[in-house]
Amino acid sequence: MPELKTCLLSSLALPLAFALPASALEFKLGPLEADLTLQADAQGAYFDDGVGDTDTGSNIDWTVRFNLERILDSGWTVGLRAEYSDAYDTDTDVDGPNSKTELDEIYVYAAGAWGRVEIGRQDGPADTLSLHAPQVGMGQVRGDFARYVSGPASLSAYDSQNEPKAIYLSPPIGGFRFGVSYGPEMRVNEDDPNPLRRTIQDNHVELAAQYQVPVNGVVLGVSGAYVHADADAATMHEDISSWSAGTELRWQHLRVGGAFVSRGDSNSFAGRDEEEVNLGAAWLEDRWSVAASAAHIERSDLSRDLAGIGGTFQVNDYISLSADVVGFTDDYTMGPSESGFAVLGQIRLSL
């Protein structure tokens, strides 16, 4: 049964961000198998904010992941997974869009030949099944640079993040798989004094599908996703209505992928009509990986171009090093253009 479990879980969880594996403490709790991962990142950046100023910034991040599971006599795998991560901005003058974030995931799951069900706080299928520009280490155009300058690419549809939901993921059948999720409410920054930063959406639904086929040693994949939710009238924001279509090519160590994303006016206050095209490539080795990606974003008030390159290297089982260089140009409809860059470095300790 362990071989069946490994095959099934790997087939139902396509990685979207390529990163070298972290170490984990594995142990048994009676009939249950458990693993615990502790991770800490120290990050520094040198950046030009696009208005003629250069500065430095730094962040300290930490993450704890815990997984507890059991294989039943029926062949089902059942378990509980929890994750908590926190990011601390060590510079009070740096307040990028992703600084001081807290992300919680906790959900129960069951998997078998019929597929996989997850219930709790977890990313939905619009995120996990969507193909797009690959990411390595710090993420390139959808990465940590956005803590310091500009804003990140979406890569896929506007999804319900890790808000509470029920998820079903089908097993792969002839290279095809699909997923669906439903959640009663989505609450992000609902107490923020700035109403523009509040997200209060109800009845969020995600639908996603993916198809992969091998052709002469090359694996070709396509994906599609759709997300809808109903905005709370008190916020005066728009409903979430977003979709994306992506593709990926895999050949040995090479990954090439891209996507078109339509976010429309999703959760916007005054209408944004946002669309994005992203494209990238990655080369993945056992101890190191590199990637390059680019994105063009159009919305009612802004045209944004992003380009980035980065890599990661596993020093040993406990230490990895990552670096990114990302450049941006923000062309505002009602203002001057801004161009700048961010150079980031990071050391990660894992146990």
Name every feature range the model reports, one short phrase each.
Residues M1-L29:
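Cleavable N-terminal export/targeting peptides
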Residues A42-D48, Y84-Y88, D123-P125, Y182-M186, ...:
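Transmembrane beta-strands of outer-membrane beta-barrel pores
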Residues E26-Y46, D55-R187, Q201, Y211-V213:
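Outer membrane beta-barrel
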Residues S74-V78, W114-E118, G175-F178, V215-V222, ...:
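Repeated loop/turn-to-beta-strand initiation elements of outer-membrane beta-barrel proteins
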Residues D53-W62, T101-D104, S160-P164, Q201-V205, ...:
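Residues that define the transmembrane beta-barrel architecture of outer-membrane proteins
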Residues V213, I319, S339-L351:
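Outer-membrane beta-barrel "beta-signal"
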Residues D202, E206-G310:
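Detector for outer-membrane/organellar transmembrane beta-barrel domains
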Residues R65-N67, Y107-Y109, I167-L169, A208-Q210, ...:
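Outer-membrane beta-barrel architecture
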